[in-house]
A protein has these predicted regions:
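Active-site phosphate/pyrophosphate-binding segments
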Residues: 288, 310-416, 527-536, 540, ...
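A short, gly/pro- and small-residue-rich
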Residues: 268-288, 436-452, 487-490
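Structural motif
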Residues: 196-198, 258-261, 363-365, 422-427, ...
Length: 1024
């Protein structure tokens, strides 16, 4: 019998009508919620959707584990650990011997796109299991991002390259050395002509020295750099403004007003962790303290834009014209000749006045993907406003050899095509996959007689090279790295290479006739040559211990703006959109395409990391896929939407319309996702998906946007044609899961209103009196643990989610299971909108277990599997749980997770290498949830008892709290009135989630406070 069609199809007209009503919902999670489709609400109101409550399919354990790869099937590793032979130095103290059950922490650093952050890595009996930020490192300040947190999973990934191969046959290291020696002997007579080296962005001092030595030995050889996430526009912009390469560093702790020109400085780019810390510390509404105001102009919603007091959606190509208009208003550019800001005159005038009024205490930050002119105008504006030396300083470049990387790669491609390359050594990267599509890098690569590739995975580039060398993970190798401010760190390994991988230093040593040297010797010898005076051994050990090399931060330099570039008589600069359209001959109805790095898989290098693939993206909440992001108005014009299936066999699945994108003869099909706040006429594609040789997790996931990315339009294109195909594609989106009912869950106001009424967050709501409760009153004689989460600080970066997953052995479940609402994350970040459909204000709300004092889950469990501890924790006793799921049904916060399958493969001994031994691995049929990191509480209690003292405030730091760069999460003893968490809970903007239910949650929230400009509209944003 055919099932009736009960799909919840999105109706954008109904959404707009609802928003225009005065009685409409003020805060909303999704477009479907506003459309008030009854089938959609049926989906939300059912605690366990049909496919999440019945085992309807025949997925067996063996079949399911194929989805897990790195998270579940670490069968390629030995169960024993392999410690490095060289002496590594643990952070703070070095015990005489390893104590079983007692973790050690080692300082190291992780480099991404040429910029490093300092880390402390937790090691259990020689096994790295968890990554934390190094509080002494200027780029991390103790915080981390999702990539650092997930890097430990990549370390144990069984899909990593495990053997050195020649034409896919396994060969020993000695065979490669012999081949290289013969090849170099033939090149040496010609000074190395025909030798090419391709790297990603290099900031390692030791690697830079090795490359310079190699080029000195082979003067006719060439070194090329290419990074798909490269900073070519930023480099070109500073060179245009100042005549040479320099490195801008922003001091946001001194900024009263910030203007972001398509810049997501809180979530990505060099120094983003520090910038997030500095920004949020100035966003707390403290008496007598000024609160930073943030303006954001962007084409696609970002984490930074979500935190803005005023956000202006605008096509990426139009931002250059706006920057020029702003420069003219502020005396930093030509007084006339551009109308780039004509459509937003009122908005631009108010921003210009605000910047003028805060001369010397404001800053303009250009986006990494914006044009060189936008960067140059931003520097000119900062110079004109007197910000240089205050909110922005300049140093010498952090990179070892800053170049135009696109031109560098283009030169290599031309040489390969002309047959001028005889030996190509590719150190890292995957140019066959991510080079500009018009370069046809794979075809040109096959013209090179000898090709060698060093990489973590046997990827698309490795497949076209004769020699593939397995690369050692950064937790397995010695190296060094530089942070955004030039601070150098020694990268020290915590475990010997699991697959006999080689570091980049060891591979280059083979090209300089020193193949016997280890990475440890190479790095140590370099720093010994740089050390002058004093005891080198003491210097070396201190550098390893601290995680930074003292005195290596680059000092500020004096620099002058190029007067011949921004002179008053210069001709007006055409907008990037005009330039592109004049070249491509685009039609008015054509769309602009914007390329962005994926918030989870980055440029594609993390595609095989299951933690990151299953991580809900901050704004879209998509997992295991990418989509073409469009505005509601664009979706209406194209006639595209999505539907939520409400039929029995597909209950809860999202099916999005598929469109065909055509640009310069290149065609790509992708599903569409509607994003409130997206610039109209602009389509955003996230890079990093559609891999063909990523591994069992990442291969075939999503669509490859690199196929539309050309050298002439790396970050934006105009003239792209979109066609509706009539097909639909299933997407795994979590924004429809775990819906909470009740009063507005997010509470926010303006700074002006907050100062008039500090208690706004609790107006009209009073918690029921304790004596009216049917629950027994708990008596607490000792510590009483609680948490406060500041909604004014959280910008939705997701670091806490991955940190929780790594700390608590939380498995991934795969795309199909996510579509059934079975994801296992203990901590979720709900995203809420407020205001208009086309430009809403965005808020993020982390939701862990509330650890209620009157916990609804405890009273319904028939076997006492969820109980109340003496310190107020809502504990889980896993071996009692029989899987009734009554507790989850009765939880108003929807924070409990059930193991419908045996998601965690605890039978595989090698999996112990990854897992935290202090946390129980759960089995099928067991409920689980946030525990407030009870293992960390117990460890601190044991230490305090040994020293006969109470637990100090701040001694216990939960995994989510430790990872957060914004310090949005604070944990501690609420019975201590002097503790930080108690002081936060005493603030008037502190409120309980669903407090009217009398659950008395231990986790509470601090309401968000925005700082809008009175000249501009805030709540009902006009978008002018």
């Amino acid at each position: 019998m055919k099932m009736p069609n009960r799909d919840a199809v999105l109706d954008l007209a109904a959404v707009r009508s609802h928003l225009q009503e005065s009685s409409g919902k003020e805060y909303w999670r999704s477009l479907d919620e506003l459309a008030e489709n009854p089938h959609f609400f049926e989906l939300l109101h059912r605690e366990f959707p049909r496919q999440a409550s019945e085992w309807l399919d025949g997925v067996g354990r063996r079949g399911f584990l194929k989805l897990m790869a790195a998270s579940l099937a670490l069968a390629g590793l030995n169960a024993c650990t392999r410690r490095p032979k060289e002496t590594i130095v643990p952070y703070v103290r070095a015990p005489e011997e390893v104590v079983p059950g007692k973790p050690l922490f080692f300082a190291t650093a992780m480099t991404l796109a040429g910029s490093a952050i300092g880390l402390l890595v937790e090691s259990h009996e020689g096994r790295p299991t968890k990554v934390e930020g190094n509080p002494d490192h200027p780029a991390s300040l103790g915080a981390t991002d999702v990539f650092a947190q997930a890097s430990v999973l990549t370390l144990y990934d069984p899909d990593r390259s495990q053997v050195l191969t020649y034409l896919e046959d396994i060969r020993p290291w000695s065979a490669l050395l012999g081949h290289v020696r013969v090849a170099l002997d033939g090149l040496r007579a010609r000074g190395g002509a025909g030798l090419r080296i391709l790297t990603e962005t290099v900031s390692s001092p030791t690697l830079a020295q090795q490359l310079r030595s190699l080029l000195a030995e082979f003067p006719a050889a060439k070194w090329h750099q290419y990074e798909p996430a490269g900073r070519d526009p930023a480099r070109a912009g500073v060179r245009r403004a100042f005549g040479r390469y320099v490195n801008p560093i922003y001091r946001l702790e001194k900024a009263d007003v910030i203007l972001a020109l398509d810049a997501d400085f809180l979530s990505c780019g060099p120094g983003h962790l520090r910038y997030a810390r500095e920004f949020t510390r100035r966003r707390r509404p403290q008496p007598g303290a000024a609160m930073t105001r943030l303006y954001s102009v962007e084409c696609t919603p970002s984490n930074t834009g979500a935190m803005a007091d005023h956000r202006l959606p605008m096509r990426a190509s139009e931002i250059e014209g706006l920057a020029l208009s702003l420069a003219a208003r502020l005396g930093a550019g030509p007084a006339a000749g551009t109308d780039g800001g004509a459509a937003h005159t009122e908005w631009l005038a108010a921003v210009a006045r605000d910047l003028q009024q805060h001369r010397g205490s404001c800053v303009v930050i250009p986006g990494e993907q914006q044009s060189p002119d936008v960067h140059a105008w931003a520097h000119a504006i900062n110079h004109a406003l007197g910000n240089v030396g205050s909110t922005v300083i300049y140093t010498e470049p952090v990179e070892a050899a800053p170049v135009d990387q696109l031109e560098s790669l283009s030169e290599l491609v031309r040489d390969m095509d002309a047959g001028r390359v005889e030996l190509l050594l590719i150190l890292g990267g995957n140019p066959v996959y991510n080079a500009p599509a018009d370069f046809a890098f794979g075809e040109r690569l096959l013209k090179v007689p000898t090709r060698l590739h060093l990489s973590l995975y046997a990827d698309e580039t490795s497949a076209l090279c004769q020699w593939h060398i397995p690369e050692a993970h950064y937790l397995e190798a010695w190296s060094d790295a530089r942070a955004y401010d030039g601070t150098s760190s020694i990268v020290q390994p915590l475990i010997a290479p699991l697959y006999n991988g080689k570091s980049v230093h060891e591979v280059l040593a083979a090209f300089t006739d020193r193949p016997e040297r280890s990475g440890y010797e190479i790095v140590r010898d370099y720093w010994k040559s740089q050390h002058s005076g004093g005891d080198f051994e003491q210097f070396w050990r201190k550098s390893l211990n601290d995680g930074i090399i003292a005195g290596t931060a680059l000092p500020p330099i004096s620099i002058s703006l190029q007067t011949n570039w921004a002179g008053g008589g210069s001709a007006p600069v055409a907008s990037k959109r005009e330039v592109i359209e004049s070249v491509s001959g685009s039609k008015p109805e054509a769309f602009e395409i914007v390329f962005r790095l994926d918030p989870a898989v980055f440029d594609g290098r993390f595609a095989n990391n299951g933690w990151l693939q299953e991580l809900p993206r901050p704004l879209t909440k998509l997992t295991w896929d990418n989509a073409a992001l469009v505005s509601p108005a664009t979706a209406e014009r194209l006639g595209v939407s999505y539907r939520i299936s409400a039929t029995g066999g597909e209950h809860g699945r999202v099916f999005a319309d598929v469109v065909e994108l055509e640009y310069q003869g290149r065609v790509l099909e992708m599903p569409v996702w509607i994003v409130p706040g997206q610039a109209d006429g602009c389509v955003t594609l996230h890079l990093g998906h559609g891999r063909k040789r990523a591994g069992r997790v990442g291969t075939g996931v999503g669509s490859n946007a690199y196929t539309l990315r050309t050298s002439g339009a790396l970050w934006m294109t105009s003239g792209t044609i979109l066609r509706k195909t009539g097909r639909q594609h299933p997407l795994a989106c979590t924004q429809f899961h775990h819906n909470m009912e009740g009063r507005e869950l997010v509470r926010a106001t303006s700074l002006e209103e907050y100062r008039r009424n500090p208690s706004f967050a609790n107006e009209g709501e009073a918690e029921p009196p304790k004596e009216l409760s049917l629950y027994p009153e708990h008596k607490y004689d000792g510590n009483a643990w609680g948490m406060a989460i500041d909604l004014n600080a959280c910008h939705g970066c997701n670091a806490c989610v991955v940190a929780c997953q790594a700390e608590n052995n939380i498995p991934i479940v795969g795309k199909t299971e996510v579509m059934r609402g079975r994801e296992m994350h203990w901590l979720r970040i709900d995203r809420y909108y407020q205001g208009s459909l086309d430009n809403p204000q965005t808020y993020f709300q982390p939701v862990p277990c509330m650890h209620c004092e009157n916990a609804p889950c405890e009273v319904v469990c028939p076997v006492g599997a969820t109980v109340h501890s003496a310190e107020g924790l809502n504990d889980m006793v896993y071996n009692r749980c029989v899987g009734t799921r009554y507790c989850s049904n009765n939880c108003p916060y929807k924070v409990r997770r059930f193991n419908f399958f045996q998601y965690s493969d605890w039978e595989t001994p090698s999996l112990k290498l990854l897992r935290n031994p202090d946390v129980t691995v759960r089995s099928r049929g067991v409920m689980e949830k946030c525990t407030y990191c009870v293992q960390r509480i117990n460890a601190a209690r044991i230490e305090a008892d040994k020293e006969n003292r109470p637990i100090r405030d701040g001694e216990i730091v939960t995994a989510c709290q430790a990872a957060c760069p914004a310090e949005a999460i604070v944990f501690g003893n609420i019975r201590d009135p002097q503790s930080r968490v108690a002081r936060l809970k005493a603030e008037k903007r502190n409120y309980s989630l669903l407090g009217g239910l009398n659950t008395r949650p231990r986790t509470t929230y601090l309401a968000a406070v925005r700082n809008p400009n009175r000249e501009l509209e805030w709540v009902k944003r006009s978008g002018r």
